[in-house]
Amino acid sequence: MPKAENKKSRAAEIVTREYTINLHKRLHGVGFKKRAPRAVKEIKKFASKIMGTTDVRVDPRLNKFVWNQGIRSVPYRVRVRLARKRNDDEDAKEKLYTLVTYVPVTSFKGLQTQNVDAE
């Protein structure tokens, strides 16, 4: 019986989903000069909580999107793709890591969390 559970968890390990993160509510009350750095930290915190991994890697395009309007004027929302992947590095502490990439959208209206087929 433990084998079946183990096999199921292995299949569920590698997954990719799209989320909309409301940065506005996460940055409420944060000083101007700390907004963009805090936004990146909050994105990492969100990804870590959702995917259950401590190793979270942010794509440079997402970082550029967050910082695009400056340190003070962070976008209200961002659409991201969270991909939980296997760590190929043999001497890594964690077996899995999460890659957070930016998904450009014209409007956030009606968007929901959706599973994405692995590329």
From Swiss-Prot:
<dbReference type="Pfam" id="PF01198">
    <property type="entry name" value="Ribosomal_L31e"/>
</dbReference>
<keyword id="KW-0687">Ribonucleoprotein</keyword>
<comment type="similarity">
    <text>Belongs to the eukaryotic ribosomal protein eL31 family.</text>
</comment>
<dbReference type="InterPro" id="IPR020052">
    <property type="entry name" value="Ribosomal_eL31_CS"/>
</dbReference>
<dbReference type="GO" id="GO:0003735">
    <property type="term" value="F:structural constituent of ribosome"/>
</dbReference>
<dbReference type="GO" id="GO:0002181">
    <property type="term" value="P:cytoplasmic translation"/>
</dbReference>
<protein>
    <recommendedName>
        <fullName>Large ribosomal subunit protein eL31</fullName>
    </recommendedName>
</protein>
<keyword id="KW-0689">Ribosomal protein</keyword>
<dbReference type="InterPro" id="IPR023621">
    <property type="entry name" value="Ribosomal_eL31_dom_sf"/>
</dbReference>
<dbReference type="GO" id="GO:0022625">
    <property type="term" value="C:cytosolic large ribosomal subunit"/>
</dbReference>
<dbReference type="InterPro" id="IPR000054">
    <property type="entry name" value="Ribosomal_eL31"/>
</dbReference>
